[in-house]
């Protein structure tokens, strides 16, 4: 059986419908796609990284990876293009689930930019910034 290999280069060239096709291919293909993105990202120290394989996080995106600090007071969701959005998004989600904020959009996969965003949020959180302040800093950086 021939297998498709999803590399960072492949992730950066996929169009939204291809992500949806992988999701429609079932849990095994969706897991492969999610793990390809997870392998290319650096999780901040002391944070958890969890991928969606069924509909654990609502099932809105073909790839959704949640990064959560140990206190668990918010998560960052890395969401792939698909039917909902043509772009990669990083979404700030408070523990209550709302209001959420899209803090970064990317026309193509860029693990460097996403990892930078994760790292910046981790540092701001560790330094005691409020959630509103973290979102404001990202907006000033041009991320939001």
Regions found by a protein language model. Give the residues of each.
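Intrinsic low-complexity, intrinsically disordered segments enriched in polar/basic residues
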Residues: 1-2, 80, 90, 143-144
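Intrinsically disordered, low-complexity regions of eukaryotic proteins
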Residues: 50, 54, 85, 127-129, ...
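Structural alpha-beta junctions
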Residues: 40-48, 85, 97-99, 126
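Intrinsically disordered, low-complexity regulatory segments enriched in Ser/Thr/Pro
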Residues: 62, 68-119
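Negatively charged, low-complexity tracts enriched in Asp/Glu with abundant Ser/Thr
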Residues: 2-70, 134-140
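Acidic, proline/glycine-rich low-complexity IDRs
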Residues: 115-144
């Amino acid at each position: 059986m021939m297998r498709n290999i999803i590399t960072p280069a492949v992730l950066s060239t996929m169009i939204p419908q291809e992500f949806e096709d992988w999701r429609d291919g079932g849990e095994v293909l969706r897991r492969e796609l999610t793990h390809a993105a997870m392998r290319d990202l650096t999780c901040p120290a002391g944070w958890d990284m969890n991928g969606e394989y069924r509909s654990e996080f609502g099932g809105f995106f073909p790839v959704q990876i949640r990064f959560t600090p140990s206190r668990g007071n918010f998560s960052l969701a890395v969401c792939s293009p698909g039917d909902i959005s043509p772009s990669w998004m990083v979404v700030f989600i408070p523990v209550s689930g709302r209001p959420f904020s899209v803090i970064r959009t990317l026309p193509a996969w860029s693990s460097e930019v996403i990892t930078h965003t994760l790292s910046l949020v981790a540092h701001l959180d560790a330094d005691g910034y409020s959630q509103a302040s973290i979102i404001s800093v990202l907006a000033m950086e041009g991320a939001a």
